[in-house]
Amino acid sequence: MAATQHSVKISTGALNLYYGSFHALRDISVDIYDRSITAIIGPSGCGKSTLLRIFNRMNDLIHGVRVEGRVLLDSASIYEKNTDVTALRKRVGMVFQRPNVFPMSIYDNLVIGPKHQGVKRPQELNAIVEVSLQQVALWEELKDILKKPALDLSPGQQQRLCIARALAVKPEVILMDESCSALDPESTMKIEDLMVELAKQYTIIIVTHNMEQARRISDWAAFIMIDQDKVGTLVEYAPTTHMFANPQDQRTEDYITGRFG
């Protein structure tokens, strides 16, 4: 897709991450733009998912993780001691590789977040459910079976439900970690179409091994690979059309053309 330059939503500078003494990411500096899709690409083990999880501090859940450098959301640091991490994760939602619906009804999956934020009136909750499902094109399919277990849905429906659950708390950014890799081609196409539509309102950052997917739907692409010290580094960051048509680094060209990966 052609990149349209919006305002910067997330910015990193001299960003490093360590797992104990292991240096996982080195000196990552990127500006991620609002209302766009940014694809993080690179070989397995280079730190793509680690970088993605920095943006809503999911790495905090791993013992021994240390982050150095600058990570800004709307120009405000998200790694201050007084950062409200719960509020951050409301603003920056996440959808994982495999559908992780909760073992409860479709309806309860969607209202659990809003209820946690204090929404109690049934009318408000019902409206949130309808709007969230409409956003992921599931309302017509599910409106008559909302009390059925979410686990009864197909994998593709479950993944769209997970996206709807993230949308129910009104995020600004949506992180998607290989969110189509466990789905069949038809479900993948629906999720891709959904991402393009959602990018009109939200900032979307995806991790993908699928170069054709990155080429099809992303506006910007960040290519990461490990260096000679086995540390993940940013090789190239550019509008996707530019990177795929005219990569500026030989390693980028070798990766996107399938010479390694």
Which role does the model predict for each range below?
Residues 170:
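Conserved catalytic motifs of ABC-family nucleotide-binding domains
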Residues 174-177:
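Catalytic Walker B motif of ABC-type/P-loop ATPase nucleotide-binding domains
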Residues 56, 107-116, 126, 130, ...:
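Short helical segment in ABC ATPase nucleotide-binding domains corresponding to the A-loop/adjacent helical element
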Residues 226-257:
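Conserved beta-strand-loop-alpha-helix hinge in the C-terminal portion
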Residues 148-153, 157:
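Conserved ABC ATPase signature
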Residues 70-77, 122-144:
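Conserved ABC ATPase "signature" region
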Residues 41-43:
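The feature captures the beta-strand-to-loop junction immediately N-terminal to the Walker
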